[in-house]
Amino acid sequence: MSEQNTPQVREINISQEMRTSFLDYAMSVIVSRALPDVRDGLKPVHRRILYAMNDLGMTSDKPYKKSARIVGEVIGKYHPHGDSAVYESMVRMAQDFNYRYMLVDGHGNFGSVDGDSAAAMRYTEARMSKISMEILRDITKDTIDYQDNYDGSEREPVVMPSRFPNLLVNGAAGIAVGMATNIPPHQLGEIIDGVLAVSENPDITIPELMEVIPGPDFPTAGQILGRSGIRKAYESGRGSITIRAKAEIEQTSSGKERIIVTELPYQVNKAKLIEKIADLVRDKKIEGITDLRDESDRTGMRIVIEIRRDANANVILNNLYKQTALQTSFGINLLALVDGQPKVLTLKQCLEHYLDHQKVVIRRRTAYELRKAEARAHILEGLRVALDHLDAVISLIRNSQTAEIARTGLIEQFSLTEKQAQAILDMRLQRLTGLEREKIEEEYQSLVKLIAELKDILANEYKVLEIIREELTEIKERFNDERRTEIVTSGLETIEDEDLIERENIVVTLTHNGYVKRLPASTYRSQKRGGKGVQGMGTNEDDFVEHLISTSTHDTILFFSNKGKVYRAKGYEIPEYGRTAKGIPIINLLEVEKGEWINAIIPVTEFNAELYLFFTTKHGVSKRTSLSQFANIRNNGLIALSLREDDELMGVRLTDGTKQIIIGTKNGLLIRFPETDVREMGRTAAGVKGITLTDDDVVVGMEILEEESHVLIVTEKGYGKRTPAEEYRTQSRGGKGLKTAKITENNGQLVAVKATKGEEDLMIITASGVLIRMDINDISITGRVTQGVRLIRMAEEEHVATVALVEKNEEDENEEEQEEV
């Protein structure tokens, strides 16, 4: 009767079991699968592949062997996982676009940068690369510890000697449980120089280290933008860098431009990149590309992007950087196993741990060589004794019945050890010649000297460091190459929105009811004075264009409100609409408060500290403030000047500190004074009196007046004139001014005062939205107190709403007759 198994049921808490089992699994993944060792930079699978190849004799000087042979050896002896996982790891070690210095020398199809898979392992062949031999060098000299394999039938290395800093040289990437590592590759010579620097100066700082290790060096080259991300990663162990493809814009023989991409960011799939660009072109997310082709071959990479003749290649390239993998970020996480525990390391710590490992390797190798040398010297000492007493030794051996008796006799008679006695018995007769005796003596003396040197090394830390430096320098001389990845410090680390938008001249309009829009400056065609105009925008009965400026899509536009606050927006941030469209409410663009409206707009190309903003309020108060104080404006605005009760900001102009200012009023008065009469004030200051007003008068315009310019006035009934600047004498700030126009019921009160050089076009917009654009030179030059000429024909109930001077448009219309008044 067979024995029955006694059932044993053990109850356990499921939450405790889940916790324990998952922790065991997590630690197994962390320690035995996903993370590299800081000493050799290898994960277990990579270490096992190299060890198995070395065991099979597949060194760099031997013929290639089938990859399947290697995979079988690895999974059969050391790595209890699937063959595909091992083969994929080996393939990566043989890819020059994945490893900065390949550890496997592959023969056959090992994949491509297009994402093509490697051929099956039964077709490909491999052997160790020359540099991977340095990872295993001295492995037979007791330099490392061994451990049992998964079933206890074999022994495998815990770590490799790694005679160069592989962790930083080839990098590593892996996802464990609750943590991940992503270490970029580096240039071999630079990393070795870093190790040497740490060995010579243990107190070296990260900035000092970065003088010899400027940053990562990727196998696919490319460009790293800026050093701040590199430094942060090196100092803290974590950081992010931006990698950009190397692209150039070249001119074709037909005059068109093309973009040539010759290097890609690390781990970017070329085929998918080209597909993505094609998708963007097809979906019209990027316009201006006429052709896209891959001209890469065995000599190098070359992606050609043909550009339409009227398109801007720089803008298209910036869009490609922004929307495709031509520019990517690489998150650095210097996580590695230190004494079996995962730790985030700084650059210096990585180098220190490697240096400590090499000290152990050199000491263990030296101790091994010392043991070997002492053992050999011990034997030679016995042989020397035998040769010194040759006749007695021969007689003893001849008279001994057995080898055991002879060995015992030698030990007792000549005070030898058992090993020495055995060596004498094993010695061939030819070694009794005089020449052989000299060789034994020479070998013994050299061993005595070697033993002294080895003991000196073990007793002297400095000697160990010297050996490390010498051997690292020798490896650098053999394997060093040129840096591939360029670190760009002069360009932007990130692409700004304006880099994706072509610079173009635009007109920005703002209506009385607060609708803003932009449209190309070319939308408006030039007409002659007295024309009927074209419809400039769609308005209703209670809205009209109040502000109009000529600017650029890349300029910063400052919006000043009636309450003395300033807001900002880029030209391209203002939505573009057609000529007759109203635009969008300003509150959708700026965070203006209730009861606040925009009544001055200034375009700024650069916030130069030598430039000023000159302010004038409705009640004649003026202020001058440096433009640089307005460089940083919050989304909810900034106080531009403090207003007195019932006052409003009327006008703002950009000056250089040396200009003449004119201020015009509704009742036809104008004052001219140097801007230096108004001292420079802080941003929130209230200002000083610019012009003295009567109770029923308000300011309608403030301008900068050049010497050879003219003063332009426009009245509410559409009349206007130009008057030479010299007719307005300079007064002191705060005066009442001079009469500048004859005000009648026919022409109405002043609505605008402008300064012109005769190089502009004049835009007039009525309250109903009718717009006319005319050459400023078509307006008559008359005296200071004249009434002027009709500039625009309007219905009886119409009036001029706003006036602006814009860049001249050369397109002309037929002249219409001038009507003098």
Swiss-Prot record:
Keywords of the record: ATP-binding, Cytoplasm, DNA-binding, Isomerase, Nucleotide-binding, Topoisomerase
Domain Topo IIA-type catalytic: 35-500
NAD as UniProt keyword: no
Main EC class the enzyme belongs to: isomerase
A cellular component term, taken from the record's GO annotations: DNA topoisomerase type II (double strand cut, ATP-hydrolyzing) complex
Record-annotated disulphide pairs: none
Classification via SUPFAM superfamilies: GyrA/ParC C-terminal domain-like, Type II DNA topoisomerase
Active site residues according to the UniProt entry: Y123
UniProt motif GyrA-box: location: 527-533
EC numbers, comma separated: 5.6.2.2
Function text: A type II topoisomerase that negatively supercoils closed circular double-stranded (ds) DNA in an ATP-dependent manner to modulate DNA topology and maintain chromosomes in an underwound state. Negative supercoiling favors strand separation, and DNA replication, transcription, recombination and repair, all of which involve strand separation. Also able to catalyze the interconversion of other topological isomers of dsDNA rings, including catenanes and knotted rings. Type II topoisomerases break and join 2 DNA strands simultaneously in an ATP-dependent manner.
UniProt xrefs under PANTHER family: DNA GYRASE SUBUNIT A, CHLOROPLASTIC_MITOCHONDRIAL, DNA GYRASE/TOPOISOMERASE SUBUNIT A
Family assignment from sequence similarity: Belongs to the type II topoisomerase GyrA/ParC subunit family.
Subunit: Heterotetramer, composed of two GyrA and two GyrB chains. In the heterotetramer, GyrA contains the active site tyrosine that forms a transient covalent intermediate with DNA, while GyrB binds cofactors and catalyzes ATP hydrolysis.
Name assigned to this protein: DNA gyrase subunit A
Source species of the chain: Bacillus subtilis (strain 168)
Gene name of the record: gyrA
